[in-house]
């Protein structure tokens, strides 16, 4: 399975009058995700399903990207801020029949889970807002082992979305950039 981890876009700052759950994307965050959606299409990111954290900024991210990919969106409480690797693993294992799956959520949850999947230290990866990780999971051990294929920053994705030459081959089986 190709597993895509997309961190939510740029959101409003937290204030004493706004619950963390309710923080929405900023206009800048929405505009950036439009470009990133184009990049995902150019990279042949084509999951049928996008699972998202129920937090507003993650839901909005999923709702902006999914139509570009031709995917449907489902809420997954397991992706709420503070998710553990075991929660990620349990969630992904429910969808092992999928060729590709996208999760939209939060940091440091994504970088910690990705590091666990690829056998790296927990602080080995950092996913910026609107950044993307692709991990190819081992079909013999559904969800348990994976190989890092991409760690793309929002800047790289914006450039790809704007038509820049692809820095990676989306079908490269060796995972080399």
Predicted segments, located by residue:
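Residues that scaffold the ATP/ADP-binding catalytic core of kinase and kinase-like folds
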Residues: 113
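Generic beta-sheet signal
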Residues: 3, 97-105
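Active-site-proximal alpha-helix that buttresses catalytic centers in soluble enzyme cores
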Residues: 2-77, 82-83, 110, 123-127, ...
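Glycine-rich phosphate-binding loop signature in dinucleotide/nucleotide-binding domains
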Residues: 43-45, 94-99
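Domain-level recognition of soluble alpha/beta enzyme cores
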Residues: 118-147, 151-156
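Short phosphate-binding loop-to-helix
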Residues: 80-97
